[in-house]
Every structure is written in structure tokens, then in C-alpha cells.
Amino acid sequence: QMCIRDREYRDIITDSGHYAALVRLGDKAIAMSTDGVGSKILIAEMMNKYNTVGIDCIAMVVNDILCVGAEPIALVDYLAVEQPDPERAEEIAEGLVTGAKESRISIIGGETASLPGIIKDFDLAGTGIGFVDVDKIITGEDIEAGDVLIGIESNGIHSNGYSLARKALFDDAGFSIDDKMPNCDTTIGEELIRPTELYVKPIVALFKEEYEIHGLAHITGGGFTNLRRLKKGVGYNIYDLPEAPEIFKLIYQQNVPLEEMYKVFNMGVGFVVITSENEAEKIMKTLKEYCNCQIIGKVTDDEKITVKTFEGSEVTY
């Protein structure tokens, strides 16, 4: 990835590779992040259901902006299509509006491009901005051994790992989107299309309380190895995850190794708040007004990430 960072003209605060870039504007900083829905779009096409991928687009961007302590405020979207399809575009827009309202942001512009011969079907991405006071930026540099990890539950796969999920469930196992999930009242398709959880309300509530937060992580592609984006020189012992959603167990049953599962998927935790042990209970009390959360582990000083799996074994990265 090429990243041009000329500090002669702009005061850039974060290093490349963090969840969002920060540029200082006086005593404020603007946070910027861009992301897309990825191959989850193929599930939408299989189901002929397009009114939720816009929520995924919003979520992938705003959840990343939160990770530097910024409150998301606005987004522009980019829809690239093989051929114009007004009905599909209207469904996609419906999801974008839903996600924007839930995140309390404005969609201030966008672009729709028809690219026959370049793109197949469609692709959807967004770029968002947020603001934060410079003295309230959270980069992860304050993380230290002994800190606790508070995990906020996911509602399923979110928007990462769909290449592996499709291979395991459809190519290898031969399931269809209409097959019933084990131990659930939903189909496989319904579980796969479920929109990504939006974490704006609970995390912004923490910002307003001005709790001592050392790090924030959106658990996306890469699973818990995303924690390495926050600070070098520390590790994480994750020993008490919530029950993994059934969709992950079904994928695992198709001979996907646990080491790969926990490196690709969120495995039931979509967002992590890192704080001191003394602050954890207060933070969880606020979070529980919005979502399910629990202490899932601690920060260590050995640079390894160790995760206790739902089978009781451990995987290390």
C-alpha cells in the first residue's frame, strides 16, 4: 500500500495502518477512513436483496473512525455498476440512509459510475470523516500490560471473511442460501446477509463520559490480529469470549482450522475497548445501556496474541 505523507504541508497525527488517518486543524483533528462492502455483495446478489449492503458500507467506515476517538459526522459513497439498475440502486440507497440515521451522520455526496467491461455487477464503498479534540485522540499508545479488554458482541460475520465463508459453506459443503441454520430459526442466507453492527452510539457515549480509554479496535478482517494496529511491543491474552454465533460454528464444521477461523472472523466480538482495570466496570455499565459486552482478556508484555477458542483450545499469533 502506497501512502504519501508530506508533513511539510499538513500535520498528520496517526501512522499509516491505523484504522483512520488524523490531520490536525488547530486544536481539532479531522479523522478520515474509507472502506467497502467487499465480497458480501455476492451474497446480496445470490439473495436478490440489496437493502442492507448500504448499512454495511456505513458501518465499516464509521466503526473505524471511532477507533481514534473521533465521532463520525459525514460520509460520501461510491457505487460502481456494470449496468444501471434504478431499482437496485434505490434498495442500496435505502440501506445507506438506514445506516446513516443509526450512526447519526450525514451523507453529503457521492458518485455512481457505470463501468461496463471494467466491473461485474456492482461495488460499493464509502469515505467518512469525523472530528476529535487533539487532546482526546486515542491511538493506542497508552495501552500497557495489565490493561483489560472489553469485548462488544457482534451479530455475525459482519463484512469480512466472505471468501472463506462462501468456499466452506457453498463450494465445499454444498449448502444453499435457503438451507436452515442448525439451532436457529434463520436460513444460511439470512445469517450471511445480516448487516454489520454499528457501534457509534455506545462508543460515542463513552467519549461523552470522558472515561480513561487506552485503545479501541474494530474487529474486522484479520480477526484479533487487528489489535496489533494499536501499539507495538504489547500482546493480548483473550481468554473469555462470548458464545460464538452459530454461523461460525457451521463454517468450522466444514474443516476450517480454528487458527484460521480466529484470524479471519470476528468470532462473536465486533469491537474492543481497552482500559485500565479500575475503569472497566464503569465503562461496561455505560456500554450495557446499548449492547452486550464483557471482559474478554488482558494486555500482556510478550507481543503474542493468544485466544481461547470455543472448543477450549488455544491459538496463538
What label would you give each PLM region?
Residues 2-4, 273:
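Short, small-residue-biased leader/transition segments that mark boundaries at the very start
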Residues 5-8, 255-256:
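Short Pro/Gly-enriched beta-strand edge/turn motifs at strand-loop
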Residues 8-155:
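Glycine-rich phosphate/pyrophosphate-binding loop regions near the starts of catalytic domains
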Residues 41-42, 159-161, 227:
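Short helix/loop capping segments that flank catalytic or ligand/cofactor-binding pockets
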Residues 53, 160, 195-198:
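A generic structural signal for residues located within well-ordered alpha-helices
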Residues 88-106, 119-122, 176, 182-193, ...:
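Glycine-/charge-enriched secondary-structure boundary and capping motifs
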Residues 137-184, 188:
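Short, acidic (Asp/Glu-rich) active-site segment that either coordinates a divalent metal cofactor
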